[in-house]
Amino acid sequence: MEKKMTFENVTKDELLKTAKVPIRVVETEADIYEDMATVMFEEIVRNNEAGRNTVFIVPVGPIGQYRVLAGKVNAAHTDLSNVYFFNMDEYLDDNNNPIPPEHPLSFYGFMSREWYDLVNMPVENRWYPISGK
């Protein structure tokens, strides 16, 4: 009987051979963030050069890529005027209002501290879900 491949028992070689989407294997967690930031940065640069907007739908996790991306953007003086971030979600309180930005679980607060406050990205290009709308 053939052993069923599961997350717990799949080897790197099996995963790479059977994956239905492109996969890159990196050595460390820091490498993941560097890779994600590099992919995002290159997309921004490529679209800027072509005169196109860049649109990302971004989660709050994983989290390490945002500061790395900010470093790349700032080092290269990259224009973010045509870059749009659609933030995926936000926690609500018991009254269905977004939790305050200073709350440790606030996506808005996290993204402000780890990305928006570090770069020159227009406020109107930052989108968050609004409860009830």
What are the residue ranges of the model-derived segments?
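N-terminal glycine-/serine-/threonine-rich phosphate-binding loop
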Residues: M1-F56, N74
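Short phosphate-engaging motifs
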Residues: I32, G64-Q65
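Alpha-helical scaffold segments in soluble metabolic enzymes
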Residues: D35, V39, V68, F110, ...
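Histidine-anchored nucleotide/phosphate-binding helix
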Residues: Y66-H77
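Ligand-binding beta-strand-loop-alpha-helix segment within the catalytic cores
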Residues: M5-K20, D31, D79-K133
